[in-house]
Curated annotation (Swiss-Prot):
Originating organism: Burkholderia pseudomallei (strain K96243)
Name of the coding gene: tig
Protein name: Trigger factor
Superkingdom of this protein's organism: Bacteria
Location of this chain's protein in the cell: Cytoplasm
Entry function: Involved in protein export. Acts as a chaperone by maintaining the newly synthesized protein in an open conformation. Functions as a peptidyl-prolyl cis-trans isomerase.
Taxon lineage: Bacteria, Pseudomonadati, Pseudomonadota, Betaproteobacteria, Burkholderiales
Record's keyword terms, sorted: Cell cycle, Cell division, Chaperone, Cytoplasm, Isomerase, Rotamase
């Protein structure tokens, strides 16, 4: 008998599953007999419990398991026979009004994958960012690298500001050592007192009022000031309250940046200390980073363009599944940050609804585009990307081995290659406008994405 598939909506379907009770009972009996061989009950040796007692104890559980298995098997058979592309998991409910003495009947309600209509790629518009790495970008990177290697000299030993002597006031960029005492309504509070506390003025590590109070002090001088803690301050006992502080400056140290010389080049991994080689390596790294960032921006542009020209309905079941994935990813992120009980954090799935819908929609569009145009990742493409990624590490061969030793990592690289194939394919047909941007603007754009 042909199965009747009812249309309940654009993607929602329903089909009735019928199971002969005698077939189900036969399977129940077989499982109970198998179970009886190992059942333990007080007063009986293992495997010697009467079958009737085993049935009384486990019949309900076994029946539920058999029905679940049989329903799933029958649904799979119907899906194949009717060429149904089921999206997500079906839900099953007994048809109470049609139960017969000889048959179990269940309604299976589910969604199917949609038809994906991708419009004319020639109408898609994409702005492609490009950037050029020159001496200015290399010099800015060297400045950053120097600041990362800053060291400090005690007052009187010289430094970036010049030798102002031991009685010169502290200024932004100086590293200061202080003692401080804080009170609220005349009473000291936890965390409000410290000795030999070290911080760098201008880094923003301390609250603004604290930094302002330390600025301009000389070694041995003190200053009193009021500090109002923000309402959202991490210390709940003092949040929103005003404290009276006394800060005493004990030591001031000048910042000193290393010279760009052979030793500096060696610290960056240039073994012979050659400055020309150092600049060439920095340029190569910046170009690699610029390529990665421009690819990311262009990929997002292409994905947005594909969504604009595509028509499809999105299965709710797939959106809900992806919402749960995003919730788990958020919990894992919290756990990595050291948040206690992160795995049980009450994160509402609804907050990811729009993101999940976009992800699912894009996945369906990309799958259709890849299938229709043969854009699957080739082994040599995957290897080329792995090799390129490995170049930025000290031991590229070890990184390559690391990738190929784990199928999940390799699958992630394969997915990246597929996306790259899609991007290249779309760029070859879309209206593309090239836009030159600075490396700083490029970095800012990808940081905000």
């Amino acid at each position: 008998m042909a199965n009747v598939v009812e249309n309940l909506g654009k993607l929602e379907r329903r089909v009735t599953i019928s199971l002969p009770k005698d077939v189900v009972q036969k399977e129940i009996d077989a499982r109970i007999q198998k179970l009886a061989k190992n059942v333990r009950m007080p007063g009986f040796r293992p495997g010697k419990v009467p079958l009737k007692m085993v049935a009384q104890q486990y019949a309900g559980q076994v029946e539920a398991e058999v029905l679940s298995d049989k329903i799933g098997q029958e649904f799979f058979t119907i899906s194949r026979a009717e060429n149904l592309r089921v999206a997500g998991q079906p839900s099953f409910a007994p048809k109470e009004d049609t139960q017969q003495e000889s048959t179990y009947a269940f309604d299976a309600t589910f969604e199917v994958y949609p038809e994906v209509k991708i419009g004319d790629l020639a109408t898609a518009e994409v702005e492609r960012s490009t950037t050029t790495i020159g001496d200015a970008e290399i010099d800015r990177t060297l400045d950053i690298l120097r600041k990362q290697r800053v060291h400090f000299h005690a007052r009187g030993e010289g430094g970036e500001h010049g030798d102002g002597g031991a009685d010169t006031a502290a200024q932004n960029g100086d590293r200061v050592t202080v003692d401080f005492v804080g009170k609220i309504d005349g009473v000291a509070f936890q965390g409000g007192t410290a000795e030999d506390f070290v911080f760098v003025l201008g880094e923003g590590r301390m609250l603004p009022e604290f930094e302002t109070a330390a600025l301009g002090l000389k070694a041995g001088e003190s200053r009193e000031f009021d500090l109002k803690f923000p309402d959202d301050y991490h210390g709940k006992d003092v949040a929103g309250k005003t404290a009276q502080f006394t800060v005493t400056l004990k030591k001031v140290e000048w910042p000193h940046l290393p010279e760009i010389d052979a030793d500096f080049a060696k610290s960056l991994g240039v073994e012979d200390g050659d400055l020309t080689k150092m600049r060439a390596e920095i340029k190569e790294n910046l170009e690699r980073e610029a390529k990665r960032r421009t690819q990311s921006i262009v990929k997002n542009q292409v994905m947005d363009a594909l969504l604009k020209i595509s028509e499809l309905d999105v299965p709710k079941a797939l959106i809900e599944q992806d919402q749960q994935r995003l919730v788990e990813m958020a919990r894992q992120d919290l756990a990595q940050r050291g948040v206690p009980n992160a795995k049980d954090a009450p994160i509402p799935a609804e907050m990811f609804a729009d993101q999940a819908e976009r992800r699912v929609k894009l996945g369906l569009v990309l799958a259709e585009l890849v299938k229709a145009n043969g854009l699957e990742a080739k082994p040599e493409q995957i290897r080329a990307e792995v090799d390129e990624f490995a170049k930025s590490y000290e031991d590229p061969k070890e990184v390559v081995r690391w990738y190929y030793s784990n199928q999940q990592r390799l699958a992630e690289m394969e997915a990246f290659v597929v996306e790259s194939n899609v991007v290249d394919f779309v760029l070859g047909k879309a209206k593309v406008t090239d836009k030159e941007v600075s490396f700083e603007a490029l970095a800012s754009a990808t940081a905000q994405a």
